[in-house]
A protein has these predicted regions:
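Glycine-rich phosphate-binding loops of nucleotide-dependent enzymes
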Residues: 1-186
């Protein structure tokens, strides 16, 4: 877990790790090797995914479109394979996120979901793309107590999936039960 007060640089660090910003000094190591991450696409190819505090979802779009935004499944000619995206999105909703209610389908729009459900979609997307490292930027921000507990259970479950996570927050109570190690940014 990476903990620090507002303005300590937590979100900036996330953006360096995920390729949004290039560092002005220092080094980034991943899997024991020094790396230079020049873009979001490169960090994704390396196996790094991010779940941002704003969740990076499009409210007006259906869940299947949100899950595959920017990484659509296409055929050899570049045409979208909508049926396959919908089928894979159903798997993600059921198997990765645990949505079993018929009220939430791949055609549901994000704006109709609760904060925790939106966070679940963002988590499912990060797991589907076979990430080795999931960077979580204040994933419990603005969530109810029950939704926060679901998020914390998800983070705890990453160990069972042999995934690593950087859980960034300013609330030590949220990260205490989910993290193995703590770094405090001051």
């Amino acid at each position: 877990a990476l903990i620090g007060d507002n303005g300590a640089g937590k979100s900036t660090l996330i953006k360096v790790i995920t390729g949004v910003h290039r560092p002005t000094s220092g080094q980034v190591s991943f899997k024991g090797e020094q790396v230079v991450i020049k873009s979001v696409a490169q960090s994704r190819k390396m196996g790094i995914e991010a779940v941002y505090q704003e969740r990076a979802l499009c409210d007006q779009q259906e869940l299947y479109r949100n899950i595959f935004a920017g990484r659509e499944i296409t055929n050899a000619f570049g045409f979208l394979k909508i049926k396959e995206q919908r089928k894979e999105a159903e798997k993600i909703l059921r198997d990765y996120i645990g949505f079993t209610s018929k009220a939430i389908t791949v055609d549901s729009t994000v704006m109709g979901l609760s904060g925790g459900e939106k966070q679940g979609v963002a988590f499912g997307r990060s797991l589907y793309f076979n990430s080795d490292l999931i960077v979580l930027d204040e994933p419990t921000m603005g969530l109810s107590i029950q939704e926060t507990e679901k998020v914390l259970n998800f983070v705890r479950g990453l160990k069972d999936e042999n995934k690593s996570a950087i859980f960034i927050d300013h609330n030590i109570i949220h990260v205490y039960g989910a993290a193995d190690r703590f770094i405090i940014l001051d």
